[in-house]
Each structure stands twice: as structure tokens, then as C-alpha cells.
């Protein structure tokens, strides 16, 4: 079973308090999501493999550490996942970025795929799927299904806020996927919004309703 990592870093929790706050405007909300995305990417990549390399400093030759093994790709779920991407890329600018477009059917609450664009070597990469919210789990499950159907094998999921129900459903559908969360909330309301949550992440990021 994949592990669930809930980050308790003080900087992440401080910024999350403003992200949740209904009085936080679009500009500040966007900047905060960007910053938390970068902080989370630092933690999500903590166990990447390193190899020894010989380098020469201005003083002498020495052995240093550099990343080895599989290369990274981040896959935001459109559209809200885009809000976390720039912060991630500011930390890992060489990472590839794919996109999976999904919308939630208002009647069934099921995720419907409408767009997929991935790096050609997706099966050779460490994949981190990115979405601010993990509510019912439907979007995350469908996005990971889509990736696996195209050959991806090493997948992680990263979000700002998750409901326990969504975590359980994602684990059931994809027990091989580790989940990384900035905050774990108790429940969903009757409209399948995370409670207390932060509202609609996409609307707050892009100033729409």
C-alpha cells in the first residue's frame, strides 16, 4: 500500500492558513499556491537517487552528489493543477510537464477526460501528478488510470488539501501510489466540496466563478 505523507512544516502550514482564508484575493492566493507547490516539491523529491561525480572546484578536485536514475515529470490536472506548476518548476526547472484535462460531471460527480499531452518517454520517468484538491478521488484516479494506460509506472500524487474519503478511494484504486498532502480534512459536504477546505481552487486561482 502506498504511503500517505501529511506535511506539518511550519512554513507550509502558515501559508495554508491564508490559502484557506476566504478574504485572500486572487493575486495573493495564486502566489501562495505557487509557494506551497515549491515547498511540497522539495519534500516529495526527498528520496530521489544520487550518484557520486568527480568535479573540480576553484580550489581542488572532489567528489560531489548529483541526481541519478529516472528523470522527473510533473503532470498537473487541468485546470487547477496549473496553479502549483510554476512553483515546482522554479525548484526543478529541468523537469518535464505533461497535462491531463478532466472535468467533473455535475450529475454523477465522475471525472471525464477531455485532454492528454505527455512527454514521449513517460514510461521512463518518475511521475508526480499535481492537483490542489483530492475530494472524491475521482479526478486523481482517472488521471492516474490515463497515465498507466500510456505506460507510466512510477507515480506519486501531490495536493494541497485532501478529504479522508478521497485518500481512501485513491489508495483502493491505486495502492502503489504514494500521496503527499499539505492538509488532511475531515469530510465532504453534500456538493462534494472538502470541508473546511478552501472552496473551488480553480476559481480562486483564475478569478472565475
From Swiss-Prot:
Keywords: Allosteric enzyme, Glycosyltransferase, GTP-binding, Magnesium, Nucleotide-binding, Transferase. Uracil binds at residues 194, 199-201. It catalyses: UMP + diphosphate = 5-phospho-alpha-D-ribose 1-diphosphate + uracil. Allosterically activated by GTP. Pathway: Pyrimidine metabolism; UMP biosynthesis via salvage pathway; UMP from uracil: step 1/1. The keyword Manganese does not apply. One of its GO terms (biological process) is uracil salvage. Pfam families: UPRTase. The keyword Iron does not apply. Binds 1 Mg(2+) ion per subunit. The magnesium is bound as Mg-PRPP. Belongs to the UPRTase family. Catalyzes the conversion of uracil and 5-phospho-alpha-D-ribose 1-diphosphate (PRPP) to UMP and diphosphate. This is Uracil phosphoribosyltransferase. It comes from Staphylococcus carnosus (strain TM300).
Amino acid at each position: 500500500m502506498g504511503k500517505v505523507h501529511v506535511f506539518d512544516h511550519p512554513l507550509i502550514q502558515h501559508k495554508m492558513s491564508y490559502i484557506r482564508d476566504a478574504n485572500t484575493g486572487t493575486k495573493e492566493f495564486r502566489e501562495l499556491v505557487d509557494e506551497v507547490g515549491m515547498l511540497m516539491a522539495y519534500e516529495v523529491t526527498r528520496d530521489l537517487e544520487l550518484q557520486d561525480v568527480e568535479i573540480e572546484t576553484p580550489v581542488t578536485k572532489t567528489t560531489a552528489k548529483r541526481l541519478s536514475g529516472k528523470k522527473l515529470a510533473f503532470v498537473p490536472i487541468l485546470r487547477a493543477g496549473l496553479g502549483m506548476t510554476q512553483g515546482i518548476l522554479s525548484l526543478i526547472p529541468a523537469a518535464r510537464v505533461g497535462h491531463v484535462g478532466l472535468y467533473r460531471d455535475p450529475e454523477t460527480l465522475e471525472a471525464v477526460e477531455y485532454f492528454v499531452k505527455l512527454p514521449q518517454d513517460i514510461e521512463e520517468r518518475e511521475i508526480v501528478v499535481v492537483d490542489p484538491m483530492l475530494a472524491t478521488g475521482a479526478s486523481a484516479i482517472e488521471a492516474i488510470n490515463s497515465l498507466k494506460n500510456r505506460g507510466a509506472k512510477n507515480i506519486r500524487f501531490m495536493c494541497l488539501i485532501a478529504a479522508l474519503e478521497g485518500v481512501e478511494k485513491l489508495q483502493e484504486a491505486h495502492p502503489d501510489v504514494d500521496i503527499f498532502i499539505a492538509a488532511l480534512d475531515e469530510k465532504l459536504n453534500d456538493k462534494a466540496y472538502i470541508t473546511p477546505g478552501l472552496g473551488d481552487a480553480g476559481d480562486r486561482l483564475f478569478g472565475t466563478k
